[in-house]
Design a protein with these regions (language model features):
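Secondary-structure transition/capping residues
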Residues: 57, 125, 164, 168, ...
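Short charge-dense sequence patches
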Residues: 64-71, 100-109, 137-144, 201-202, ...
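Extracytoplasmic electron-transfer domains, predominantly the class I c-type cytochrome c fold
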Residues: 134, 140-196, 226-284
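Short, flexible micro-motifs
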Residues: 25, 48, 117, 133-135, ...
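Periplasmic c-type cytochrome electron-transfer domains
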Residues: 2-105, 146-156, 171-194, 264-280
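Sequence/structural segment immediately N-terminal to covalent heme-attachment motifs in c-type
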Residues: 106-131, 145-149, 154-159, 199-225, ...
Length: 286
């Protein structure tokens, strides 16, 4: 240690005059450019605090000499967006949904706007792109419980399914086991028969008889369903809750009665029509 060379820059830099146990502190000030930048940022922050909202108080805050407000800016931006869309939305509101689809300009506007509305209000259940998930039907295929025309989709959106609205779509599947209509063995036989229907195979004649007496009135003798009643097609292997035997047994025994909200009153007429056009465009529209 004693033989190490002296590398001190004391002769060229100088010290601050402080010394601790023989250790001296060299005086190396910050570069001037760094100091100038620092002073500029301090000055900028002071000017900013004077011009814009900055210092909070107990009940309010200093609003700045410019009177700027982010809330007002957002409100203005939203109003400007609404004003720019007003011409299209008025036309959509006053037209039938079929006319909206027939007009290329309105159709493109509706698909673009409907996509945003769908993401905000519908994708939570039906998933992005309307692909659906267990308990929530796909909107991208050609299998519809209540019909897939523009008018059908608009009505479903407007009034919902079992939503409590006086014009809602309503159907009621019995709880065949819970209500004592069928016994467990009979329900299992019907489930096997439904599996056979979905696979386009002949089912057990005894199970077919039980199906005909209890299920055909809604689903049809051939299991093709009935859109007037919201009864699904049982022959296309498209299932909302699942098509395996155990799931079918549970569905028959305890029933399924999902609910879709009525969007009338939550969304305006133009938005509902835009949403109907978007859903129709997903691939399964009729």
């Amino acid at each position: 240690m004693a033989n190490l060379p002296n590398t001190s820059h004391e002769d060229t830099v100088g010290t601050t005059g402080h010394e601790w146990d023989g250790i001296r502190e060299l005086n190396n000030p910050l570069p001037k450019w760094w100091l100038y930048v620092f002073y500029a940022t301090v000055l900028f922050s002071v000017v900013w605090a004077v011009l814009y909202p900055s210092v909070p108080g107990l009940r309010s805050y200093f609003g700045g000499t410019l009177g700027y407000s982010q809330r007002d800016a957002v409100a203005l931006s939203l109003q400007q967006a609404a004003d720019s869309q007003a011409v299209y939305r008025t036309k959509i509101r006053d037209a039938a949904v079929e006319q909206v689809k027939a007009d290329p300009e309105l159709y493109q506007f509706s698909v673009s706007g409907g996509r945003v509305v769908f993401a905000e209000n519908c994708a939570g259940c039906h998933q992005s792109g309307g692909i659906g998930t267990k308990g929530y039907p796909s909107l991208a295929d050609d299998d519809w419980l209540w019909g897939g025309t523009l008018a059908d989709i608009e009505r479903t959106l407007r009034f919902g399914i079992r939503s409590g609205h006086e014009e809602a779509r309503v159907s009621q599947m019995p709880r065949f086991l819970a209500d004592g209509i069928l016994k467990q063995k009979e329900i299992e036989a019907v489930a096997d028969y439904v599996v056979a229907l979905s696979e386009q195979k002949p089912g057990n004649p005894q199970a077919a008889a039980i199906y005909k007496d209890n299920c055909a009135i809604c689903h049809g003798d051939a299991g093709k369903g009935n859109r007037e009643l919201g009864a699904p097609n049982l022959t296309d292997k498209i299932w909302i809750y699942g098509g395996d035997r155990n799931t079918l047994v549970h569905t028959i025994a305890q029933s399924r009665n999902g609910v879709m909200p009525a969007w009338s009153g939550r969304l305006d007429d133009a938005t509902i029509k835009m949403l109907a056009v978007y859903v129709h465009s997903l691939g399964g529209g009729e």
